[in-house]
């Protein structure tokens, strides 16, 4: 099913702007205003014990400074001269027979936002020339990403530390071109979610709905998924990153159709990712227990979104989401005690064990989040984004409530923590599995811009699921 969406943003991918941004960050970190930035694209790799190539995925840091998706490529950026050069593979007559003519140097210069395009055979000679022109100064590269045949010997100083940090910090704030790519990925992915909603009541297996999603994305220009899609029915939705996607939607033990399908899936458009989660009732209507949990999670997300703007501490937004979850579970009778005591004891982690969200861009879990996985507070241990939100950053907002026995049972059996959970009331909710709602938003100075258009109001999802 083809999906009609807005066209790709006009003009070239702004590689030169990105190179200047990275160079400025290197200078801010105290490394001067001259030198050569050197990066390599991803190499072609073969499948082990086979003559077939592995699926190719360009190195994100290389693409950020080049806009070039070609394998086996290189780049240099002369900071002082403000000259960005990419090096692309030359024509290999033997390969032309199988794969056709590759991009020429002249064509690449027209396509990419660079100052020069050369053959990969000229990388070392160009490095030596730059070094001579600069008086043998500094080259910046990323450790373990320099090919054995590349030589930096003419340079007086080689820095393998600052470049990776400078690129990853620069990638946090997106420019308008990047946001347009992210919006396109979200538009295509959101409409693919709708296609799944419409097929939910007739599908017989998780893989059928995954196939509908992936097919809708591919027919609209997204050949790759941002990550392995999650199509988790029934209690499978209690597993955060469920991978199988192959179980029947009628339970083999009870003979009953499972309640819901959690869909965590997003397409990758020109190296930029969407990361969207929705839940659809497989009968076309949420069960009472499913609807109660869904409403809590939706309120968790709405409360979080209301807080978002540049400078807000992400930990505060995450804490608010936990408090909303606690209040909702108290109202249902699943939890008992006071909101404050439950928050301090971290009881909500039994039902909401992951972080509220993360930066999004060329990687699903994008750079610059500065997580602290050693945090002793379980509420924050898996929070992939820490600190103040950056204007122009793109974040996921993905609260959830899950009924995972592996996680909850230790709380129930704990002499200290078991008293806070009403096991009798909880029994009614195991079959819900899990509910997560995830949108992708651009942080602005005054609020946010939600890129995700997939419906999330329960009434709208039910309408689409039963639409003929």
From Swiss-Prot:
It comes from the Eukaryota. It is an enzyme of class 3 (hydrolase). This is Probable Xaa-Pro aminopeptidase PEPP. Mn(2+) 1 binds at residues 275, 398, 438. Catalyzes the removal of a penultimate prolyl residue from the N-termini of peptides. Belongs to the peptidase M24B family. The keyword Metal-binding applies. SUPFAM superfamilies: Creatinase/aminopeptidase (SSF55920), Creatinase/prolidase N-terminal domain (SSF53092). InterPro entries: Aminopep_P_N, Creatin/AminoP/Spt16_N, Creatinase/aminopeptidase-like, Pept_M24, X-Pro_dipept-like. GO terms for biological process: proteolysis. It catalyses: Release of any N-terminal amino acid, including proline, that is linked to proline, even from a dipeptide or tripeptide. GO terms for molecular function: manganese ion binding; metalloaminopeptidase activity. It comes from Paracoccidioides brasiliensis (strain Pb18). Mn(2+) 2 binds at residues 264, 275, 438. Pfam families: AMP_N (PF05195), Peptidase_M24 (PF00557). Binds 2 manganese ions per subunit. Disulfide bonds: none annotated. Gene3D superfamilies: Creatinase/methionine aminopeptidase superfamily (3.90.230.10), Creatinase/prolidase N-terminal domain (3.40.350.10). CDD domains: Prolidase. Its EC number is 3.4.11.9. Its cofactor is Mn(2+). The lineage of its organism: Eukaryota, Fungi, Dikarya, Ascomycota, Pezizomycotina. Keywords: Aminopeptidase, Hydrolase, Manganese, Metal-binding, Metalloprotease, Protease.
């Amino acid at each position: 099913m083809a999906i009609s969406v807005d066209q790709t943003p006009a003009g070239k991918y702004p590689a030169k702007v990105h190179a200047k941004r990275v160079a400025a960050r290197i200078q801010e970190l105290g490394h001067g205003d001259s030198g050569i930035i050197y990066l390599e694209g991803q190499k072609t790799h073969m499948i082990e014990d086979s003559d077939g190539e592995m699926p190719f995925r360009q190195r994100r840091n290389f693409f950020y400074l080049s806009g070039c998706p070609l394998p086996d490529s290189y780049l240099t950026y002369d900071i002082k001269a403000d000259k960005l050069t990419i090096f692309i593979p030359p024509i290999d007559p033997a390969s032309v027979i199988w794969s056709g003519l590759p991009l020429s140097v002249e064509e690449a210069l027209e396509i990419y936002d660079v100052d020069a395009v050369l053959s990969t055979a000229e990388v070392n000679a160009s490095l030596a020339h730059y070094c001579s022109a600069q008086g043998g100064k500094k080259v910046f590269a990323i450790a373990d990403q320099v090919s054995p045949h590349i030589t930096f010997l003419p340079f007086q100083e080689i820095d393998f530390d600052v470049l990776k940090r400078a690129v990853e910090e620069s990638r946090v704030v997106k420019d308008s071109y990047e946001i347009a790519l992210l919006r396109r990925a979200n538009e295509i992915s959101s409409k693919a979610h709708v296609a799944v909603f419409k097929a939910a009541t007739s599908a017989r297996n998780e893989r059928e709905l995954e196939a509908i999603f992936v097919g809708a994305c591919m027919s609209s220009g997204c050949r790759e998924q941002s990550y392995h899609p999650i199509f988790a029915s029934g209690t499978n939705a209690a597993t955060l990153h469920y991978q199988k996607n192959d179980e029947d939607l009628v339970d083999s033990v009870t003979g009953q159709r499972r309640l819901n399908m959690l869909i965590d899936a997003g397409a990758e458009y020109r190296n930029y990712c969407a990361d969207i989660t929705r839940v659809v009732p497989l009968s076309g209507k949420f069960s009472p227990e499913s609807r109660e949990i869904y409403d809590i999670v939706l309120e968790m997300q709405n409360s979080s979104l209301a807080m978002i703007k540049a400078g807000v501490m992400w930990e505060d937004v995450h804490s608010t989401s936990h408090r909303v979850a606690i209040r909702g579970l108290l109202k249902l009778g699943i939890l008992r005690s006071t909101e404050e005591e439950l928050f301090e004891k971290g009881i909500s982690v039994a039902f909401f064990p992951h972080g509220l969200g993360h930066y999004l861009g060329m990687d699903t879990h994008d750079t610059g989040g500065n997580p602290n996985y050693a945090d002793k507070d379980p509420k924050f241990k898996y929070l992939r984004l820490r600190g103040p939100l950056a204007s122009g950053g793109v974040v996921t907002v993905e609260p959830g409530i899950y009924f995972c026995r592996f996680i909850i049972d230790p709380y129930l059996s704990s002499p200290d923590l078991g008293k806070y959970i009403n096991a009798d009331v909880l029994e009614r909710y195991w079959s819900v599995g899990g509910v997560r709602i995830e949108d992708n938003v651009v942080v602005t100075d005054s609020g946010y811009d939600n890129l995700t258009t997939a419906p999330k109001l329960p009434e709208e999802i039910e309408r689409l699921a039963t639409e003929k």
